[in-house]
Amino acid sequence: MADGPGSPGGGGGSHESGSPRGGGGGGGGGGGGGGVREQDRFLPIANISRIMKKAIPANGKIAKDAKETVQECVSEFISFITSEASDKCQREKRKTINGDDLLWAMATLGFEDYIEPLKVYLQKYREMEGDSKLTAKAGDGSVKKDVLGSHGGSSSSAQGMGQQAAYNQGMGYMQPQYHNGDVSN
């Protein structure tokens, strides 16, 4: 293991030793050294690859080392932001980190440009989460059926689709547009 349990993000240890990076199979992975298993530290490489492919032209290719580098950067970024948010929660004597804590940490650490789109996302998420909690309390989903019947096809799920569309529009900066080989956001 390259990292000790108390070293968020790796502390400079190299992962070029041929170890699997979310490649599936390879059960276990932890040798009992007390560190975090690599598959627990990193997001799956397939997910990283899928996200990266959305940002390049359809015929573009991404080298394996580029995917692995982004995979490690994402892990480091998550640790960096979460650590700052955790420190804030400890100072405020709270045990749970919430979305607002993460946004505060991002602003504190210099990622101000991402705050507004993430606030939009967080608001939409909370609205949708609230709707799903109400539906879950109804048991078998009869609330949706009642709404469908009394409003002629206008249901809370249709509202959810509208919210998802608003979310997709708000986060459109993440999917660059390509015109004649040029990238524009």
From Swiss-Prot:
Keywords: Activator, DNA-binding, Nucleus, Transcription, Transcription regulation
MF terms in GO: DNA-binding transcription activator activity, RNA polymerase II-specific; DNA-binding transcription factor activity, RNA polymerase II-specific; protein heterodimerization activity; sequence-specific DNA binding
Region (Subunit association domain (SAD)): 70-81
Pfam families on file: CBFD_NFYB_HMF
Source organism, top-level taxon: Eukaryota
GO cellular component terms attached to this protein's record: CCAAT-binding factor complex
Tissue expression remark: Ubiquitous.
Biased composition (Gly residues): 1-36
Localization, UniProt: Nucleus
GO biological process, one term: regulation of transcription by RNA polymerase II
Ranges annotated as biased composition (Low complexity): 153-164
DNA-binding region: 43-49
Membership in a protein family: Belongs to the NFYB/HAP3 subunit family.
Subunit field text: Heterotrimeric transcription factor composed of three components, NF-YA, NF-YB and NF-YC. NF-YB and NF-YC must interact and dimerize for NF-YA association and DNA binding.
Purpose of the protein: Component of the NF-Y/HAP transcription factor complex. The NF-Y complex stimulates the transcription of various genes by recognizing and binding to a CCAAT motif in promoters. May regulate the expression of photosynthetic genes, and may be involved in chloroplast and amyloplast development.
This protein's name: Nuclear transcription factor Y subunit B-3
Organism name: Oryza sativa subsp. japonica (Rice)
